[in-house]
Amino acid sequence: METIQSVITEWSDSKSWDHLFQHNFKDSNWSELFDPVNFKFKFGTTPFSQFQILPSVISLYLVIIFSIKFLMRNRKPFSLKYVSILHNAILCIWSLVMCVGILYEVIKRITAEGPLFTVCETVSGFDKGPAYYWSYIFYISKFYELLDTVIIVLKKKPLIFLHVYHHCIVVWLCWYFMYSGWNLQLWVVFLNTFVHVFMYYFYFQTGRGKTVWWKKYITMIQIIQFICLGIAGLLHSAAINLNSSPCFTHYPAFISAYLINFSFLFLFSQFFVKSYSNKPTSSSSTTTPTKTKKID
């Protein structure tokens, strides 16, 4: 009860929010983008760490996509074939680099100090060093991923709630992970980039007009991803309560992450059931690019 009460107090106390608005984008130290060894997330000076960026970018994103959708209502869709191919190739390669990067750095730390830090980070280790640098690059990538939706509306493809909700909430959540220093972000980055390698490769191939038979398995591994994150959360809770050495945690981030994780699990499962239930086997074995709905 004490923990829940402290979370409610922190969320409701206006003074705890005042410092979020005391930094400007012009204060950014851009050299931090290229220094993984000495990386430390510094609120206000690390590029894109300023809180004001989030409501500004998310609001602009929503205005742009729904304005384009309105303006395109009586127009023919743009092809954007080569733009889509390039965009998805960039995100496939970027996801692969982040996945390999964070896996390499986490394995290095596991070799040196054991695996406990992946669910129980001490105050001296959180939110700094090469592993968390890849988490930061992951956060930066979420801004670029917003172009997914711009391409969708220009091509007049179906725009579903899950897609827009996911893009809006993930930008904020990744920032919150970095801001709070919550160490389960390492799990999030590895699992999500692993899934995205296959997902953006799928979109790259369908953009080229290729048939991809394993479309439905992408949604399945996304669902498995959220289940794995739930298990990681249980291990984190156990480590906090049972481990003799102090684990650093941030309860508002923990609760926010798992409420959002549950919402994703529900929405992706619902999407999977609607998309693949009560369909003939033959229809799920082929994919045409024109009917592909981008959900992530």
Curated annotation (Swiss-Prot):
Compositional bias annotation for Low complexity: 277-290
Residues making up the signal peptide according to the UniProt record: none
A single MF term (Gene Ontology): fatty acid elongase activity
Disordered as annotated region, ranges: 277-296
Reactions catalysed according to its record: a very-long-chain acyl-CoA + malonyl-CoA + H(+) = a very-long-chain 3-oxoacyl-CoA + CO2 + CoA
GO-annotated cellular components: endoplasmic reticulum membrane
Membrane-protein topology: Multi-pass membrane protein
Protein localization: Membrane
Transmembrane segments: 51-71, 83-103, 134-154, 159-179, 184-204, 220-240, 253-273
A biological-process GO annotation: sphingolipid biosynthetic process
Function: Could be implicated in synthesis of very long chain fatty acids.
Name recorded for this polypeptide: Putative fatty acid elongase DDB_G0272012
Source organism per UniProt: Dictyostelium discoideum
